[in-house]
Amino acid sequence: MRYTYVRQHDTTDCAAACLAMVCLHYKKEITITRLRDMMGTDLKGTNLTGMEKAAQELGFSTAAVRVDRENFLSEFTTPCIAQVITDEGLAHFVTVFKKTTIKDDGERRRHMLRQEEERKKCADEGKKFKCRDYVIIGDPAKELKKISLDEFYKNFTGVLLLMTPTSEFKTGKQKQGSMVKRFLDLLWPQKKLFFYAILSSVILTIIGIASSMYNKILMDEILPYGLKSLLVAVILVFSIVNVTSALISMVRQWVLIYLSIKVDIPLMLGYFGHVFKLPMKFFATRKTGEITTRYSDASTIKSVFTSIALSVVMDVVMACVTGVILFRMNATLFSISIFTTLLSILLVFIFKQPFKRINEETMQQSAILNSQMIESLRGIETVKCNAEEDRELEALEREYIKSLKISLRSSKISTVQSLISTLITTILGMVTSYVGIMQVLNGEMTLGGYMAFSTLSSYFTNPVSELVSLQMSIQQAQISIKRLTEIMDYESEQDETREYTEMEKIDGDIEFKDVSFRYGSRSPALSHVSFTIPYGKKVALVSSSGSGKSTITKLLLKYYEPESGTISVGGVDLDEYSNASVRRAIAYVPQNVELFSKTIYDNIRISRPEASLDEVKAAAKKADAHEFIRKLPLQYNTYLEEAGNGLSGGEKQRLALARAFLKDANLYILDESTSSLDFGTENTIFDMIYNQLADRSMLIVAHRLSTIRDCDLILVMDHGEIVERGTHEELLEKQGKYYELWSLQQGIFRDKKRGSKPAAPVSAAKVVEDEDDGESITY
């Protein structure tokens, strides 16, 4: 029986790859990218709830069960998905295709007892017990393999997801855009260049075939009759032909280079242009290395289509033309050449699957290694402050060694294929020589004819030899096409066919009405949240970490859509507005400030590219950033290092605040925007906010409650719900959750369970850590 195997693209793709295998078993083809979305896969992977949800959506009846060893041998539907723990201690999923099955309960128990007795006997005799029970699994990170039940149970957690297709299950192939068609669309505007490349190739082919007649004329016409005058003419003609061939070859190479560049620009920029249009969910659930390696995929595809594809087309044409000539010259020798070609084609098919597996492993490991390097360099300060350089280097070394091992296996496969190909060509070439020379000796063929045949036969056999040598590159391009197509087919964050209203300014109340939301298939981040931000009022969100404050800001910025409920601005549903116009109308300062390798002036005016230097300076003064900028060597023209390295956390936050103030929006969202500032600077900035921006709407997410005590409304959140609301004074009078947080920060909260001893004063920064709702969701 043939089993359907799908390799994962990334370490978090195992669940999606397993479900893709099950779907393929039932004749349904669906991409890993689509399944990731259906499951709610994120950087932590996928949980069982997400897998069940996706399977049911596809039309499967599902049951998550826990089985012991005896029950695993009972009869149940396969393929199914099993949870295992890898040797590195990570949760992982594999597909179970087939296993030892004993239907009768009594026989199964007797089987287990017999097996236990055999184990004891082997242990007593010092022998190794050989388990005859087997499991055939598809491990998306490794391979399809048959292992013993003992080996399987070393990693099996006992959890299975059983799946049976229902009447709602639909077979068929998921509709995908064709990467080949996309590429041909890129080539079409360059059709003139492509035509020149083909024309030059045809001319070179004709010249090559004509040149093969040189030896025949020399051997059969000139040497036997001593035609010295004709010799000079023939040499002169063929010299001109060869020089012409060299010049045309050079022109062809220039055309191909220029064609490659002309295709490269729209292909590469088109990929990143599409990536920038993707929703935040896409970036939040993927590692940076996984996204950047698709750039390499695009480069691989371009290389194949602009050079290899053209060569293959011309090689095929050349093989057909020379094949006809060779057949007419000598049918016997031609049959040997045909046999050589057929063996070479057979060799390509034999090595197709090994090359496919090794290419998939190479690409997956490349993404993992890139992500590891990016994470290590991005977190270098944390690595150094904890003196973890050696440990981080060990982790990087492990991934690099894995890459080298895969590369070594790839080289071994290529070497074996190359050796077999060389043997086929050499042995059959010798056979051709023997038969040809015998025909010359027997007078059945002239020496010149034989030499011409030998020269021409290379034009016939070389295309297939080239195909064999390029098989790795071609199959790598096929995998790259599949991976890149999945990204290019990923839906943009906004429907480009729909007409949206453009938001000029936020000039009304903002209302959240019964809004619920969750990240993927995780626990709800928000549950039935309702509140209003009156126009021109200041509203604060407070809570302990992971309660949903930042999620509210992300929904308001249209990074995500609510699972249920509505968000409206001035009575109009937020969904009616285009994403870009909503974000332009809001001045947002996130928790994590991102600065770019540009001047300070350019970094601040990102929010308003047309802003003058005077306007940027005015915004910097509001953010209390002007003074520290003046002390820099080139002041506002100072070029920042990558990610603003060299600036303190407080300086980065002040630049981010300057961006927001430069935008001069009607709604400001400050998400822990002053957490790195000292109390004096923080108070200065909030005094400016309450005075100079008194008429602007504002949503402030804060842990330091002293900064939001003057807000018009304070919302207290707990586990995704609003548990209290009111002004600072009203909430203190209630002596509820807000009172506890305030008292804790003021150092006067008493632990009622332990007595009346006052708690030691603790700064707000020590009470709670910076919130990241995406990271605080539990399984």
Across the structure, where does each feature detected by a protein language model lie?
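Transmembrane helix-loop-helix hairpins at lipid-water interfaces of multipass membrane proteins
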Residues: 194-248, 255, 327-332, 443-447
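Juxtamembrane loop-to-helix connectors within ABC transporter transmembrane domains
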Residues: 215-216, 256, 274-321, 378, ...
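Cytosolic ends of transmembrane helices, especially the final helix of ABC transmembrane type-1 domains
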Residues: 365, 369, 381-388, 412, ...
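Loop segments that connect adjacent transmembrane helices in multi-pass transporters
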Residues: 273-290, 361-409, 481, 499-501, ...
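Membrane-integrated ABC transporters
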Residues: 1-210, 224, 228-233, 252, ...
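ABC-type nucleotide-binding domain
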Residues: 117, 123, 503-779
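Transmembrane helices of ABC transporter permease
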Residues: 236-245, 249, 311-361, 431-445, ...
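Hydrophobic alpha-helical transmembrane bundles that constitute the permease/transmembrane domains
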Residues: 198, 202-213, 243-250, 301-304, ...
